[in-house]
Amino acid sequence: MNKESIEIKEKEGLALINGTQFIAAYACCSLSKFHNCLLNADIISSISVEGTLSSVVPFSKEISDLRPFKGSKEVSKRIHDLLSNSQIVKSHKECDKVQDPYSIRCIPQVHGASWDAFYHLEKTVNTELNSVTDNPNIF
């Protein structure tokens, strides 16, 4: 195998064995999948609201503004928007049900916590992507 050996220069050896670039790239792919799962969960939940003939009141701005959590507010708005033209929800607007199932009413809080975790992870990954990982640092 008459291969010529290469001469590794400063920083190149570490670049071959250092995993920060791979880990950051893998984190980006995982973040994208996580985002997709969260959006799908919100969409599926809006279908569940229709399937249980529930009200959109728990997803109103007035209720979501009672708590200061970004993720919860966004989930409420997303589900409320998804159901804004729902004929099923509109047909049960005046029903005599006292309350919808708790599992429906707490969707914004549960999904919102996951969205807040996503935003934290997104910030961390963006910080890593924009950070120096060279060793040694040459100025």
Where is each model-derived feature located?
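Accessory "access/gating" subregions that flank catalytic or transport cores
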Residues: 16, 49-139
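Active-site cavity-forming subdomains of large catalytic enzyme subunits
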Residues: 1-69
